[in-house]
Amino acid sequence: MTDPIPEGFEPHFRKSPLTDPWEPLYSRVAEKSVSIGLRLAKPHTNSRGLIHGGLIASLADNAMGYSCSQALGWKVSLVTISLAVDFVGSGEIGQWLEVECEVIKTGATLCFAQSLIKADGVTVARANASFRVVTKKQ
């Protein structure tokens, strides 16, 4: 039996060559944030069988960027200016990994966000990022 996907999550709405190997990804869209989640599997791990820090950092960056886009009404594009991640635990194959975001401040040229990354509800990392707001390409 496959573990269920938590309530409110649906197949992720955006595909990317970077995240294709990590599929299936799921997202939950709220009024001012986007959470990303996935069931941890072998391709998500390092040589010790634990979740890879690069996966955590990349998903946090994506989720915080989407959250800023959501807060700004999806009318602009964003590029990451800075990203910091503190690793405080680890995740294992089979656990549900979820990136929960909060947009701290939006402006005409910058957006700031933070996130907690949890494996089965236990915090394994925290991250924060700054994004440059740019005109969306038509």
Regions found by a protein language model. Name each.
Residues 1-138:
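Terminal targeting signals and extreme-terminal segments of soluble enzymes
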